[in-house]
Amino acid sequence: MNIRRTIIGVSLGVAMAVPAAAQEFGTDADASYAADLWATMEDGRLVGANALYGFPYEGIDPHGALLETFYTKATVGGHTGTLIVKRNYGPVEIDQVIGNPTEHLAAITVMFRREAGYDADNQDWFWVKYLPDGSLDKNPKGVSLAGRVAKGADVGCIACHSGDPDYVFTSDASFD
């Protein structure tokens, strides 16, 4: 009887652990970190009501018809890392975005290089997709797009960006 309880207990433990291991993004911890990152970006005027603007350039799916990309360093939770902020607009003309960027902003996609060991398989990048108001976008299953987004999947942030040696298509700059 003890053996049966042990087998049932182990089986339930494994069954409960598999779904948890399968989801490597969108956790409460990811959402909290994304909120801290948003606050840091607001302070740096990269997002929010006082954001600075650049000149948009032509983009491609999944990001948008027009984009603005900013590269900098930021400190979140005591760690300083490379921060890449991409504002996704469209489908509109450049003059429309320049004339009223907030009206045409669809999303803000961000890569932040976290501390060594966060996700060594993918160069320690933290991925997040915000809606214009700073809330987290969600995938069709309702999972927040923050953290190791779509790690191990055939499509998604990591799958696409792993096609470039440093995961950054828009620049050949060093991000160490």
What are these regions (language model features)?
Residues 1-8:
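Bacterial N-terminal signal peptides that target proteins for export
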Residues 7, 69, 95:
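Sparse, context-dependent recognition of short Cys/His-centered cofactor- or disulfide-binding micro-motifs
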Residues 16-24:
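Signals and flexible motifs at protein termini associated with secretion
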Residues 23-26, 30-34, 75-176:
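Sequence context surrounding c-type heme c attachment/ligation sites in exported
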Residues 23-86:
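N-terminal secretory signal peptides
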